[in-house]
Amino acid sequence: MQIPLLTPQKDPMGAAIADYFANGKASKLRVFSSMFDEDEIPVKQLFRNFTEMPALEQEALRMSEGRILDVGAGSGCHSLALQEMGKTVKAIDISPLSVEVMLKRGVKDACLENFFNEQFSGSFDTILMLMNGSGIVGKIANLPIFFHTLKRLLAPGGCVWMDSSDLRYLFEDEDGNLDIDIDDDYYGEVDFRMQYKNIRGNRFDWLYLDFQTLSLHAANNGFKAEKIREGEHFDYLAKISRI
């Protein structure tokens, strides 16, 4: 998968993170999609501490052990919480502005890196993918590449902690039946574009994955997925490990 590293001119989230870190406040981080109305991400939420995190995230951090890889680490909130627990973590992100903020905030090992880059190497006991961690896969068709990457980076006996959401509630009729065309793309495949002030990012694909589909594709690629906990908004935390 070719996911390019971002430049500051095309990195609205990184700019918002840098602004909030420098000034203690930020403007609207706007989110656009062809499927939904315009929305916004509260930038303060990207700087939450452990006690402010949802229960699913707290559980994943508590269960993380050994050498940990924090994928798409953003402002570094999860990595910092792990460090406070005395755990060893490497944080990666494709945003240079975010990586700069992480280092300034005290993340000991943060680097600019694409998770899917074949040149990125390491052996990790835990791979942490939170805040809809399945999102970076982009499309169902990319799941084999995702599992190939896990095989390359997971240490023997290692596991992935990943959260995601089932969007079926958006497509259910009054009787609870799924009202979708089976010839359409998978209903969890979404496109987004972000904007912060005058900085507009490129459109990107984002994957929301129901647990049954995750479990099926995991099994087809030599892994097993276990649903560890359910959230309050059709979200869940999964543990993924080699069979």
List where the protein language model places each region.
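N-terminal auxiliary segments of SAM/dcSAM-dependent transferases
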Residues: 1-30
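Class I SAM-dependent methyltransferase "Motif I" SAM/SAH-binding loop
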Residues: 72-76
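Conserved SAM-binding strand-loop segment of SAM-dependent methyltransferases
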Residues: 106-117
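Conserved alpha-helix/loop element of class I SAM-dependent methyltransferases that forms part
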Residues: 47-67
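A short glycine-rich, Lys/Arg-flanked "PGG" loop and its adjoining helix->strand segment in the class I
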Residues: 143-156
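Conserved SAM/SAH-binding beta-strand->alpha-helix loop
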Residues: 95-96
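SAM-dependent methyltransferase
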Residues: 19, 155-215
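A short SAM/SAH-binding and catalytic strip from SAM-dependent methyltransferases
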Residues: 124-144
